Regions:
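A short, exposed loop/beta-hairpin motif centered on an aromatic-Gly-Thr core
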Residues: 22-35
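Residue-level detector of alpha-helical secondary structure
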Residues: 34-37, 41-44, 57-58
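Short aromatic-glycine-(Arg/Gly/Cys) micro-motifs in beta-strand/loop hairpins
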Residues: 4-24
């Protein structure tokens, strides 16, 4: 049987992950749904300025199941080819 991990305040925890095709090290952040969702919104903003380009390909947030996923096309202008980011939020479980 699996149960969702909770912090010391009794709040359920979620794992926020970013994986880029140009990096072997994923970014991982664990916190409550609200804080992970805030970070998700910050990381999925479309940008097009002198140094960076980011375009959303797919973005889906499910408040009902507390999951989120997004795919983005990115480019550090002047520093090579495009790369892709895959961003997710999922529940964090442990074996009980």
């Amino acid at each position: 049987m699996y149960s969702q991990i909770k912090n010391t305040k009794g709040e359920k925890l979620y794992i926020f992950t970013i994986v880029n095709t140009n990096s072997i090290k994923p970014y991982i952040y664990v916190n409550t749904w609200e804080k992970c969702l805030k970070k998700f919104e910050e990381c999925t903003k479309e940008l097009d300025n002198d140094s960076f380009f980011a375009q959303i390909i797919h973005k889906n947030i499910s408040e009902e199941t507390h999951t989120a996923e997004a795919s983005m096309r990115c480019n550090n202008k002047g520093w090579g080819c495009d790369y892709f980011s895959y961003i997710t939020i999922n529940s964090l479980y442990t074996e009980a």
